[in-house]
Amino acid sequence: MVMKLTRTVSVAVTGGTGQIAYSFLFALAHGDVFGSDCGIDLRIYDLPGLERVLSGVRMELDDGAYPLLQSLRVTTSLEDAFDGIDAAFLIGAAPRGPGMERSDLLKRNGEIFSLQGSVLNTSAKRDAKIFVVGNPVNTNCWIAMSQAPRLNRRNFHSMLRLDQNRMHTMLAHRAEVPLDEVSHVVIWGNHSAKQVPDFTQALISGKPAVEVIGDRDWLENIMLPSIQNRGSAVIEARGKSSAASAARALAEAARSIFLPKDGEWFSTGVCSDYNPYGIPEDLIFGFPCRMLPSGDYEIVPGLLWDTFIKNKIQISLDEISQEKANVSLL
């Protein structure tokens, strides 16, 4: 059966030889992001010196015989990767090494994402959508956005979907219900140990999760810190950071924007300009969002914070603000 394509999108993926990209690329080629009727002009980027590994990734994609892949190239040139793209998935980042402080990581990645933002500014389409995965993701996303003034600030996203998925699963397991019975899962703030999984907004079988779970102490003192520290727990258990789950979360995060479901809430880090919650402008901050018929998103308005959640959000806001201040001095 010949698949009829309705459109083709140009897509760049950085960090193309890494573990997350290795899982994500095949989901992308399969149609999990843009749908089964959308062709893909794919450019895979990684650093000079990794050409041989990139060629191996290309071999596997070629061998997968994906009908949606209309063109495929691997490159060590950001200009080549970002030229005329509709979407970029910025996965590559400097990893946090043993004994490395978060401030050291901010400095190293500040240079990487400043350059990538500058090249996006000169090379990508003005309405390109940019998804940042490399940590510290909120601040890396802000750096790239600040270096790309030609692009629409609203189209920069930092990934919080993995945190959302973790919370979704924990609530379903605790309530002993299928995953599709859980909705309105919200992550506020930074993707870090200070993120805010807001259980007060979540619904289980259409009822408030707080009522269904019936154990506020578990929500505050077991579930919340478990989600905040899940990444570290995976590293401790596996010896490596989350990869397959992160790739799936990235595909879902992008799909929520490109192929939205009616009324679906999704958590994503976006530019805080004109937000309805009083968060200072010019930050990348995690909000619950939903898509509009126009193809744009809106931050879900009108949600109330109890004292516990409000205090946690302030802590996360302080962290993001401090990270921004630190990189602004670089």
Swiss-Prot record:
It comes from Chlamydia abortus (strain DSM 27085 / S26/3) (Chlamydophila abortus). NAD(+) binds at residues 15-21, 109, 116, 133-135. Belongs to the LDH/MDH superfamily. MDH type 2 family. Gene3D superfamilies: Lactate dehydrogenase/glycoside hydrolase, family 4, C-terminal, NAD(P)-binding Rossmann-like Domain. Pfam families: Ldh_1_C, Ldh_1_N. The active site is at 191 (proton acceptor). Its EC number is 1.1.1.37. The keyword Endoplasmic reticulum does not apply. Catalyzes the reversible oxidation of malate to oxaloacetate. This is Malate dehydrogenase. SUPFAM superfamilies: LDH C-terminal domain-like, NAD(P)-binding Rossmann-fold domains. It is an enzyme of class 1 (oxidoreductase). The gene is mdh.
